[in-house]
């Protein structure tokens, strides 16, 4: 037990993230500012201090579902390490990431069936959404039928890559004009949340529709000349030169 403070301090200060930040006048970098720390071994607090924040038994509930606990300096006390998960669950924070992921998956699947289709669940997207929410609630939104005239990829890409939505498909694999998103919160006022998400997606799809229609005004052959104006790499010519080399290589591989 005497070794734990030093070990925990070393672990926390050695963590790496793709993007980090500094705050106040500290040189320490972390993924987000540290506001409080819970470090327990059984009933005892493991003493650790980072950027002036000392470890203790106090945590906070969900930012929106239990705002008083977030604003109140007293917070909620976790009496021992074994109680950590349940105390936070009682305050609308689902700590178990595996349970949270499977809850999201099941909510998305069930809601898609209710809407007359089935959800296309990308595992990478599911993993990302899992770490964006503490108390997941799935909800369904819609978009105008006219956008279904776009290629499937033009609809799914802004849904998945930009908005973190799950597409809803028919039995034949074609898209329904619906999507499922996951809210970090409860079931109150879901229609308001859905409306906001629909508005954002509508703008994305309108952009996709515009660029798709603009691209169709010219055949692909008409765009070849533009490849000459884009550099590929110093000493290796432009994108047209690269394309021609690929044509020759493909011909040689195919026909010898």
Residue ranges with predicted function:
Residues 120-244:
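Catalytic nucleotidyl-transfer cores of nucleotide-processing enzymes
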Residues 115-120, 212, 253-256:
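Inter-helical turn/loop segments and adjacent helix faces that build the functional surface
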Residues 107-111, 226, 249-252:
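A general alpha-helix detector
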Residues 28, 42-46, 52-55, 171-173, ...:
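Short, glycine-/Ser/Thr-/acidic-enriched flexible segments
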Residues 243-256:
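Histidine- and acidic-residue-rich, metal-dependent catalytic cores
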Residues 1-148, 155:
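Long, basic N-terminal domains or extensions that often function
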